[in-house]
Amino acid sequence: MKFERARPFIAIVFIQCLYALMSIVAKLALNKGMSPHVLVAYRMAVASALITPFALILERNTRPKLTFKILLQIAILSLFEPVVEQNLYYSGMKLTTATFTSALCNALPAMTFIMACVFKLEKVTIERRHSQAKLVGTMVAIGGAMLMTFVKGNVIELPWTSNSRGLNGHTHAMRIPKQADIARGSIMLVASCFSWSCYIILQAKILAQYKAELSLTALMCIMGMLEATVMGLIWERKNMSVWKINPDVTLLASIYGGLVSGLAYYVIGWASKERGPVFVSAFNPLSMVLVAILSTFVFLEKVYVGRVIGSVVIVIGIYLVLWGKSKDKGGMLQPNAGCAETVVKIDQQKVPTPDNNQVVSISYHLMIPKAAARSQE
């Protein structure tokens, strides 16, 4: 019985460890000269090959009819994620560091909350304490992101960061990003979070009409692969040699990224059904901490006081938002629970749907996740 209760904790901690390692591997590949656009295309190719067979087999009897309208919506969905989001994410990571990227993207729940308010998927009542917590948490998380971007502070000295080489054996791992690169990278990372938030909103609307999550993910990966390939060919048209993959960390990043994406879909989806999306979201900062620790060894990355404080502020903001979401009326409904109407929950947001037989619960983690993840992917 105790193990049954502990399984969701073990599973999510395991996934966060995989996310952290994915951030490190991706950064190694980018440092080696791999194009972010090529990495996205190859990662989606692996994810498509992994997920499609399961979708064809497991949902062969339950998959609804695919209309042209739904297909067009999925094509737009795949533009937001993975094409735009992941290209911006990896481009931002290339200009900054793995730790900075992981920490800044922790502000995603706050940005999702803002987008949900814009699209009227989130109800805010100023008089309610939980609504106040969500608003304050959003502002705190954004403030932490700004603090990370513009305030560096003193270096926190660590004995092993004074070595001449990182664990990857290359002195270029010690390259310290310029402030201009940090600013440009931050803009790209924030834009990637915005794209992910748009993806969440559209995903919920599509799932209300096409209730086959696995098939939707497979279609999104296939279309994303095609769109990312076209984008990569256009972007790298003057240097087609970047598409060549050698049996080194660039190949590892492509395969590992795709495998983690596919595995995370199942594990996070299962954990969301077992304990709810707020439970899953609460573990996001773990990946950031693991990336920060690994980066000091692998990249000899310097740890700055300002970045640490900014990361802590972001985490505080996240938990304020998540606490507020957990207190929303009906916020803890579980899938397949009896309910008078069907709702689609986006990390605790509710969207009425035409059918009134069941409850579909998803969170922004449910589909393919960034290094991180991004936590998330």
Curated annotation (Swiss-Prot):
GO MF annotations in UniProt: transmembrane transporter activity
SUPFAM superfamilies reported in the protein's UniProt record: Multidrug resistance efflux transporter EmrE
GO cellular component: membrane
Subcellular location: Membrane
Ranges annotated as spanning the membrane: 9-29, 38-58, 64-84, 99-119, 136-156, 187-207, 214-234, 251-271, 279-299, 303-323
Superkingdom of this protein's organism: Eukaryota
InterPro entries: EamA_dom (IPR000620), WAT1-related (IPR030184)
Domain EamA: 18-149, 194-322
Membrane topology label: Multi-pass membrane protein
Keyword entries, A-Z: Membrane, Repeat, Transmembrane, Transmembrane helix
Family according to the record: Belongs to the drug/metabolite transporter (DMT) superfamily. Plant drug/metabolite exporter (P-DME) (TC 2.A.7.4) family.
PANTHER family, per the entry: WAT1-RELATED PROTEIN
Listed name of the protein: WAT1-related protein At5g13670
